[in-house]
Amino acid sequence: MNKNIVIKSMAALAILTSVTGINAAVVDETQQIANAEKNVTQVKDTNVFPYNGVVSFKDATGFAIEKNTIITNKHVSKDYKVGDRITAHPNGDKGNGGIYKIKNISDYPGNEDISVMNVEENAVERGANGYNFNENVQAFNFAKDAKVDDKIKVIGYPLPAQNTFKQFESTGTVKSIKDNNLNFDAYIEPGNSGSPVLNLNNEVVGVVYGGIGKIGSEYNGAVYFTPQIKEFIQKHIEQ
């Protein structure tokens, strides 16, 4: 082959590689800017609290509340049965906190979209701290209450398949509270169903059930943990 042709081909390849790298960097930077505008950050280490209190379903989120007990939504639990599995705080790594079988599902009898699951204590696949659920997953405590304008955060797995089960945190404020419903403006997407809504002390004030995926929306909703909701949860915590 002509030496000049080889040199030109190598130069063209170098330029293409360089441009591709630049494009990838631009896409990544654009995504980071978009997330910053939404007050969303990717969690780097899910083995520390509060991130290790969150669990993943195939297309939704849940979180631990005391021994072997998980909270999520009824519209999530309806797709699961006893013996199905959940994964503890993955972050692109399905075995990060262990994989556990569900052994009981209790849906709230009212209209509120909340469900309590109990899982087997011993993992099907071990986590970073062994096979025990309670050693790999740190449970949240209930907040005493919440009020309008409180700062909150939502932790979960938005678009889990697309984001390869990476965990994200979004921040915002409480916009309204009425009965068992809490509205907030932290950004959420499909997959955030079942995410904990936490105050600045990382105490849980509610569980996300839905939203409209719009920046600044005040219509993202959570089941607010009123005394009657807390009582239901307490009755279904494994003793």
From Swiss-Prot:
Alphabetical keyword list: Hydrolase, Protease, Secreted, Serine protease, Signal
Where is the major localization of this protein?
A: secreted
Q: Name one Pfam family in it.
A: Trypsin
Instruction: State whether keyword Secreted applies.
Output: yes
Note whether Signal occurs among the keywords.
yes
Its Enzyme Commission number(s) read 3.4.21.-
The lineage, from the top, is: Bacteria, Bacillati, Bacillota, Bacilli, Bacillales
Cite the active-site annotation: H75 (charge relay system), D113 (charge relay system), S193 (charge relay system)
Q: What is this protein called?
A: Serine protease SplC
